Amino acid sequence: MTRKKVKLAYISNDSSRKATFKKRKKGLMKKVHELSTLCGITACAIIYSPYDTNPEVWPSNSGVQRVVSEFRTLPEMDQHKKMVDQEGFLKQRIAKATETLRRQRKDSRELEMTEVMFQCLIGNMEMFHLNIVDLNDLGYMIEQYLKDVNRRIEILRNSGTEIGESSSVAVAASEGNIPMPNLVATTAPTTTIYEVGSSSSFAAVANFVNPIDLQQFRHPAAQHVGLNEQPQNLNLNLNQNYNQNQEWFMEMMNHPEQMRYQTEQMGYQFMDDNHHNHIHHQPQEHQHQIHDESSNALDAANSSSIIPVTSSSITNKTWFH
């Protein structure tokens, strides 16, 4: 059976108080002895009481004098570093409890004003009876929320993301984590055409793809080569093609009426499920046919100052824009 917890209060009965003193004093001496023996520290105890004229000491008078002299040899800062009496201990506890109470009151007030703010937004302002202090706190909370909203809007604008899009897209774009697609000229088993709707969308694609990268679409697909093998018969003049592409873009922007023909002729071949960044194998007869068609398309386009990217044939090819 467990002993009932003793209430920490002054004992008004003299006999009970004296008996409790003797019992507790003996227990205190025992605890000091155990602490000194188990932990190997130097300790002493001096107890004054109204029932005895001489104080009781532990372990002895000489032992107490030795411990006190060692304590006085320490610097004053070390002496008061962890020294505490009953009054100081109570003050520390009160200060700690007061700080905890202040922090909890602040959090509770913020939650209360947040609830009032959202209730007012949905038209339930009449259910609250707010005074001047409540209105000031509510105004402070509204200002904080507005600052957060404006800061997020500024972040989205700086990252180039339209308002309403996912914030994760803005973060990824600002950090440069969005990979650029690697376009490779190849055949695909499906026939899907995505048509360009406006000149602005085509300009976006033109800025998205490097003009130098468009050179690979102007040649028919060659035979299958290995990952580390490169065809030796492709002698491209990149500088000349880059200048031609610049003239082509300027011609397109100056003559928007040619956009319909341009969108019908332009496309990017998409990779099939091979997942290799090299040109796929095709039959030899099909290669000659593509070469002839692309040559005719290039001759026709040069006469109208427009450079098509691929041939107009869409059989067994995938186009995307």
UniProtKB/Swiss-Prot annotation:
Residues 1-61 form the MADS-box domain. One of its GO terms (cellular component) is polar nucleus. This is Agamous-like MADS-box protein AGL80. It comes from Arabidopsis thaliana (Mouse-ear cress). Residues 89-114 form a coiled coil. PROSITE patterns: MADS_BOX_2. The lineage of its organism: Eukaryota, Viridiplantae, Streptophyta, Embryophyta, Tracheophyta. Probable transcription factor. Controls central cell differentiation during female gametophyte development. Required for the expression of DEMETER and DD46, but not for the expression of FIS2. Probable transcription factor that may function in the maintenance of the proper function of the central cell in pollen tube attraction. Interacts with AGL61 and AGL62. Forms a heterodimer with AGL61. Interacts with MEE14/CBP1. Its main location: nucleus. Plants lacking AGL80 (mutant fem111) have defects in central cell and endosperm development. Expressed in the central cell of the female gametophyte and in early endosperm. Also detected in ovaries, young siliques, roots, leaves, stems, young flowers and anthers.
